[in-house]
Each structure stands twice: as C-alpha cells, then as structure tokens.
C-alpha cells in the first residue's frame, strides 16, 4: 500500500486558475483531488490542532475506556487517552507522545508518562525509543530499548547522515497494543514549514535574484541551512548581535561557523549562481513537548519499571541540563564503631529508604549509592531543593533525639553525559565533580548550593518563600582552579514532619 500526503498553499491570481484545473481533474482522481481542493480552500488549522478538532469515534472510545480500566488509579489519564485515541488521526496514533497528550488535556506530564509506562507492563502499550532527525525532527529509527539504539542514522527526506550524540534527539513514544492495537502504517516525512515545528522560515530564491527579508527570531539558537549543501551557519540570538545578515557567498558563510544576530534581523540574500537556492532557518531550541531520553531516565517511575534498560556499553549521550543531589552521612566510620556492624548497617538501610521516599515524592530518582552516600537526579531545581529541605528537616528533628547521625547535602545543576555503567544508567561530567566537591564543604547543619543554581530566578523565588537563611561562601574546590562561590542554606526552625510511615 502506498499513500501520498500533500499540502498546497496557493496565493495570488494563480489560485483561482489552479483550483479550476484541479476541479476538472476530479474525473480521474475524484476522492484525492476533492480533498486537495478542500484543503486549498480551507482556512482551518492543520496538523495536531486540526486532528483534535474531529468528532470522537464513540465505539472506539468505549473500547479504549474498557481496556484502560486495568490502570485504575490513573482516572484522568484513562479518560484523556481514550478520547485522544478515538479522535486523533492515524499519523498521530502511530506515535503516542505522553507530554503532547498531557499538555492538550492539561494533565501533569510526569503522571501521564507514568501511566504509559505502567501500561506497557500490562500489555496495553508498546514502548519505542525514536531517534529524531536534527533537521526535520522526524522519527528515523525506532528501538524497543535504549540498549538497542544505533549511533549512526540516515534521514532520506533530508538527505543527511547524522550521529546520535545528544539525549534531546532520542524521544520516548508509545503505541496501542494487544486488544486495542491499531494497524501499523508508515510514517512519511512532512517537513514543510507549516507543519514542522522546528522550521522557522524556508525560502526559495531564483538564479541571480536578490531579496531583502525582515525576520523575527523568537528562539535562542537557529541553524541556517541550504537544502542542497546542508548546514551553513549557527545563529545565536543576542541583543548585541548583527542587525543585518548578508547571505551571498555560501562557502564563506559556512567558514564563520557561528554568528550572533538580533531577534529582529534584516537578511540581505543574493543568489549569484545559475541554480535555485532554498534556505531554511531551523530552530535548535529544545522541544518541550518531547519526552527525551535524559528526562525519562531521570524519572523514578522509569528507573523502577525499567531498571535494567541502559545504553549499550561504550555509547554515551549528552544531557543538556540535570539537577544533582549528593548526600553523605557524617562520621559513618565512627557510627559503625560505636553501634556495631549489624545495627549500623540497619540504620544505613533505613536511611536509604527515607531518602528514596522523600526524593521520589518530588519526582527525583536515586541513581546510585556508594557506601552510605547517595547520588540523585531531578529535572527541576525547586523539586531538588524541596527534597533537600524535607530530608534535612527530618534529620534535624530526629538528631535531637540522638536517633540519627548528621547528614551532609549538596546541590548543583548543569550539563553531563549519560552512560552505561555496570548495566545501569549513570552520569559523568564536570557538573557531578563540582557537586561532589561541594559536598566536601557541607556540614550536617546546612545544605550547600552552587552559586549558579542559587542565582536562578526560579530558585530565588522559591527560597524567598521558605523559612530558611543563607550565607555566601567562597572556597577552592579540590581538583579545580580558582575559588568558587556557593551558598549555605540553614533551616530557621525545625517543623514537625510526618513524611514517611
């Protein structure tokens, strides 16, 4: 079976003529041409928005509602996914995207992702890791696990080979399975500007033609790309950048590698060759509706249900941003000596259970424990701070009864790499090294926070609402040159907690 999908946008005096020609062609291809004519005449939205404006299939919705009852605690997600599955077009049903569905129905993203993950365990969904083309963002390769991901991939639509080196280029999606499965269908590239969110502007220019264009770039980073020659230039939006961008000698432009431009920039474009040129501005900013590999791997629900899934040995993915919490029991050697091995070991195990409970409550995940130290990840700085404060509150309360030792905590955020270590997902990089060294500076009466994390506006807003004080400190961290600024957060008072049973 072969299916072609096309969208035509006509403007100016030629629109009426072409419409009349198409209407005559309905004798040969009546259904196809009729739909094409309707699309040309229609001013209705296209893509996802148009798909969700359709009337739900009542029978399909009832079938989905009945099957999804196996996931009883997720009442809101059951209703939303049943509605989505009964009205979305075939193209969107081939890749169920949890964040896209959650945003449309105004549901919590992580709960919706947990719903799909739980559903795979009972056979309602199948899970796919999609490798996305950096140009058109289409899913070019799929695998059932992170371990099966291929590093080198080819996109036929864009005519490029690319390597998977960033976690943002790997997205988790799902398909209905079992009794509610749908027939598989090929996914075609739909890389025209009106339906591909990454394409900001795409423009043709005839041989020896000149054009002056006023562009508005609302994002942070873009790639200027020639459809024949590929990548030309990386553009960074900066108010101090160029107000005019001259595009004439493409090879010379490519050698500049990166240029800063203003958000409102004038492009002076001249095609000096004998062939048509097509230039495209691709937005390189992260896509916030994609459940990317770095986000999913940091969630407690994924680590709990798919604890054995990790990248293949030797493969690594760059992670743009994660928040790390490091903790360590103060004086653990003395603890074992005073309490004895058996009692001290039980205390440490109880400590891990406490940490797991409070970290998971804020959608964080424990990556690993080393001795009595804990390394945990969060997607959000405020969630990490909330967990750290709750942990310290608990220890402050129980240390007064001499039932728990002191605990040191440090927080830092930034980029890192995701790797396979001993068949489990792990992280490495300078961000983690700094967090580890900050833990050396912590005491059991404070929470050490890196200067970069502390200065974030959302962190400042969060801290202003907490009953804590802070002091600034500067030290040379072991293994790093120069002093680094960090902050010591201290609880003003201990609040009664009932955080774990």
Question: In which residue ranges do the predicted regions lie?
Answer:
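N-terminal accessory interaction module
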Residues: 182-287
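Cys/His-rich short segments
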Residues: 120-188
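Catalytic core regions of nucleotide second-messenger enzymes
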Residues: 316, 362-369, 395-412, 427, ...
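Catalytic NTP-binding/metal-coordinating core of nucleotidyl cyclase/transferase enzymes
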Residues: 309, 313-387, 394
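Catalytic/regulatory signature loops of cyclic-dinucleotide turnover enzymes
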Residues: 398, 432-455
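Beta-strand/loop substructures that line and gate deep hydrophobic ligand-binding cavities in soluble
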Residues: 1-27
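Intrinsically disordered, glycine/charged-rich C-terminal tails and inter-domain linkers
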Residues: 228, 444-445, 451-501
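Regulatory cytosolic signal-relay segments
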Residues: 262-320
């Amino acid at each position: 079976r072969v299916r072609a999908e096309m969208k035509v946008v006509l403007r100016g005096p030629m629109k009426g003529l072409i419409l009349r020609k198409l209407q005559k062609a309905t004798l040969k291809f009546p259904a196809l041409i009729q739909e094409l004519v309707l699309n040309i005449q229609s001013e209705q939205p296209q893509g996802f928005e148009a798909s969700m404006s359709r009337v739900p299939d009542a029978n399909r919705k009832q079938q989905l509602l009945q099957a999804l009852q196996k996931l009883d605690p997720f009442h809101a997600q059951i209703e939303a996914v049943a509605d989505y599955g009964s009205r979305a077009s075939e193209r969107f049903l081939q890749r169920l995207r949890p964040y896209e569905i959650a945003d449309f129905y105004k549901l919590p993203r992580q709960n919706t992702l947990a719903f799909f993950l739980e559903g795979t365990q009972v056979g309602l969904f199948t899970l796919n890791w999609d490798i996305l083309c950096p140009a058109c963002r289409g899913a070019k390769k799929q695998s059932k696990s992170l371990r099966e991901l291929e590093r080198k991939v080819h996109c036929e639509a864009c005519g490029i080979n690319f390597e998977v080196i960033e976690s943002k280029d790997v997205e988790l999606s799902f398909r209905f399975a079992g009794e509610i499965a749908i027939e598989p269908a090929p996914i075609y590239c739909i890389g025209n500007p009106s339906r591909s969110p990454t394409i900001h502007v795409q423009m043709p220019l005839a041989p020896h033609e000149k054009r002056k264009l006023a562009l508005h770039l609302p994002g942070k980073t873009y790639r200027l790309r020639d459809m024949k020659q590929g990548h030309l230039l990386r553009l960074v939006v900066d108010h101090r950048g160029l107000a005019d961008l001259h595009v004439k000698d493409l090879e010379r432009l490519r050698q500049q590698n990166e240029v800063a431009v203003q958000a409102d920039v004038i492009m002076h474009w001249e095609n000096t060759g004998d062939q048509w040129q097509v230039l495209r501005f691709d937005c390189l900013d992260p896509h916030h509706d994609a459940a990317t590999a770095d986000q999913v791997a940091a969630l407690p629900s994924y680590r709990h249900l798919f604890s054995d899934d990790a990248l293949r040995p030797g493969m690594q993915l760059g992670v743009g941003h994660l928040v790390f919490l490091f903790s360590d029991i103060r004086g653990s050697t003395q603890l074992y000596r005073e309490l004895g091995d058996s009692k001290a070991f039980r205390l440490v195990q109880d400590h891990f259970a406490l940490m797991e409970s409070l970290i998971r409550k804020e959608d964080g995940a424990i990556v690993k424990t080393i001795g009595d130290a804990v390394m945990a990840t969060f997607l959000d700085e405020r969630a990490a701070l909330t967990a750290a404060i709750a942990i310290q509150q608990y220890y402050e309360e129980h240390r007064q009864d001499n039932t728990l030792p002191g605990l040191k905590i440090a927080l830092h955020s930034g980029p890192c790499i995701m790797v396979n270590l001993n068949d489990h997902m792990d992280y490495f990089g300078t961000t983690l090294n700094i967090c580890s060294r900050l833990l050396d500076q912590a005491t059991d009466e404070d929470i050490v926070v890196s200067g970069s994390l502390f200065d974030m506006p959302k962190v400042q807003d969060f801290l202003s609402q907490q009953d804590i004080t802070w002091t600034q400190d500067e030290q040379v961290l072991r293994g790093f040159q120069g002093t680094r600024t960090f902050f010591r957060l201290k609880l003003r008072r201990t609040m009664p907690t009932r955080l774990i049973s």
